[in-house]
């Protein structure tokens, strides 16, 4: 399959999956799922679906729910997009967003520590300067 066609097809699959999970599923847990990426095999028989969920939601339960409906979802994707095969879906939790949030927080904490150190060093310099001017020759 040509790379451009594959990319467009993957994008269409991603949109269709999101729509199916939001509109067709009765399981409320699946309403909190965001499809972050999909990878379709060249023969279109296998589809790896990466998803994330809101913090505080039980990702293991959500994964189990996704596993229960993957046959239906696969068939709907194939029917809607007129695929030759209904791809075998494998869902994988995508923690990259959570990792990114943690990294940003760590960087912010480091920045705050650096600011505190700079403030302390400026205070030390001003104290040293004041002491020097108060000395008698």
UniProtKB/Swiss-Prot annotation:
Ranges of biased composition (kind: Basic and acidic residues): 127-137
Record key words, sorted: Cytoplasm, Ribosome biogenesis
Family: Belongs to the RbfA family.
Biological role stated in the UniProt entry: One of several proteins that assist in the late maturation steps of the functional core of the 30S ribosomal subunit. Associates with free 30S ribosomal subunits (but not with 30S subunits that are part of 70S ribosomes or polysomes). Required for efficient processing of 16S rRNA. May interact with the 5'-terminal helix region of 16S rRNA.
PROSITE patterns in the cross-refs: RBFA (PS01319)
Protein name: Ribosome-binding factor A
Keyword Cytoplasm: yes
Any one Gene Ontology BP term: maturation of SSU-rRNA
Localization in the cell: Cytoplasm
Gene: rbfA
Spans annotated as Disordered: 112-137
Example GO molecular function: ribosomal small subunit binding
Assigned GO CC terms: cytosol
Subunit record text: Monomer. Binds 30S ribosomal subunits, but not 50S ribosomal subunits or 70S ribosomes.
Family matches, as Pfam families: RBFA
């Amino acid at each position: 399959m040509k790379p451009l066609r594959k990319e467009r097809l993957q994008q269409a699959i991603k949109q269709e999956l999101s729509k199916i999970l939001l509109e067709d599923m009765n399981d409320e847990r699946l309403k909190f799922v965001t499809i972050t990426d999909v990878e379709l095999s060249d023969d279109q028989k296998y589809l790896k679906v990466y998803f994330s969920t809101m913090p505080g939601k039980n990702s293991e339960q959500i994964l189990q729910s996704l596993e229960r409906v993957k046959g239906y979802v696969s068939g709907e994707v194939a029917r809607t997009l007129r695929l030759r095969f209904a791809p075998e879906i494998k869902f994988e939790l995508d923690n990259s967003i959570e990792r990114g949030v943690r990294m940003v927080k760590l960087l912010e904490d480091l920045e705050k520590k650096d600011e505190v150190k700079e403030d302390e060093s400026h205070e030390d310099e001003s104290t040293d300067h004041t002491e020097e001017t108060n000395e008698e020759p």
